[in-house]
């Protein structure tokens, strides 16, 4: 049997103590590139700290003024002022707040009736942010000197991300005005407003994203997946042409343009995210990329920009982790090919050599369920964690297994350090993290295969992963659980009602149960994404209802733990309450000895980086699995 999650294990410390290991988030360089600001929770909660890129001790800036959850990125308004996002208990209705790094004084700059996301900053002049204060997520400009706000775009579909050019004259951003809902184009608009122009880069239906401007403002680093995989290229505004750097072998995305015009990008390879540099790229064909000398893992650059990545002395700011090494913040010397650590990972009482490594595996998913009309077999990649090779002792007994399903769906289970997986492995569970169809990292066709098919073949992929894990001789196939959050929570619910014979238990975290209701309750930009994923909710009403887990609640046999933050704006808590009520109508009782368990988390939304809340999640997961498996 699995050990109690409170027992001391051979890695040192109790598995639940992994939740308390100090963590940093969103390292962001100052405009001069000589300092970095980041969230760090070494004090017990997330606070802001500043550190020189040359090393030395970090200095604390905030004292409770910032949110407990460091979920949103930071930015520098000028050399002495940092911007952060502040919401109420995880509701994501962010205000944009400035904090003086010397005095700690704060000032709310932007407080819309809705959500605000800072996309980029022209230091000392203005910031560009997205807001759904109107009928859709659009771009706005806030002038730092006058305090005035003006709307820059008026699209009917959401704007995603933006980049201000070096002179503060133009803004590149992502939107879609095509009939094809999968399409994403890069637009450019004057920083004072006006009519935006669309860059003619790829084919309709492809995604084109801007990443960084060149110093003269006449070229733009971008990526496009018209040929199936995302390629990095340089758009020349003078010639209106693109020079492609990537050869299309791997998924690649741009990161930053160095002052000497070397281009840094990331490359996805078997769930690892590798930093690469293109040093000489002028010409007609693909250029040669050099992979940076870091352990195989994940360079942790977020979806939204955390400012520049090049330090004052020309180094690359590099946050990185591996399956067995927690996040490290380093400065990488692109010339010498070595790195210097700024923030060391704190492993506390744990021996990192005893953490469980991730093995990249593949399996066949060839079972087409009867509710899928056009399903086809696929090879699915996944990460396998075998605790018999790591921190858990081999007592000769088969281990219970957990299939951990990522959210998104257009993200990927990657070879970064996962405290949740290491907690499970240290507690004696085998873990599989499948990258089902719809996941990122394998090209456009694989990623889009889920569109119009939520609850269909991607769930067949997950179930096939469960059967594959159960077939390992060291796994007890009768003690298998499925866990996931957000879309992963939708998957946990769906697995339990569609494949009831496979699972002994499940945990659905901030999950989706009723798709039509979710659409009605969503923010406008999330409605647009749901339409992209599942089509028009009225024209496809029967599909939306049939693929909702709540429509099949009577088929569920295993026990489920339903966990939901009461302030979740993406998957509202009403999704959990509807499923709970449906279970009660089926005659199930709630409680530790009942047919299901139900927990609502106060002061929490769609997840949290707060240490206290993280430990609470560890305890909920560990105690439920111990009871049910």
What are these regions (language model features)?
Residues 1-20, 512-513, 573, 618:
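Terminal disorder- and signal-encoded targeting elements
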Residues 2-4, 15-26, 31, 35-72, ...:
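Peripheral, non-catalytic segments that deliver or gate enzyme domains
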Residues 196, 360, 431-433, 598-600:
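Conserved beta-strand scaffold positions in the cores of enzyme catalytic domains, especially
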Residues 400-404, 431:
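Hydrophobic beta-strand anchors of alpha/beta hydrolase catalytic cores
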Residues 405-407, 564:
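The conserved beta1-alpha1 loop
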Residues 428-443:
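Conserved alpha/beta-hydrolase
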Residues 439-629:
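Active-site-proximal cap/loop segments of hydrolase catalytic domains
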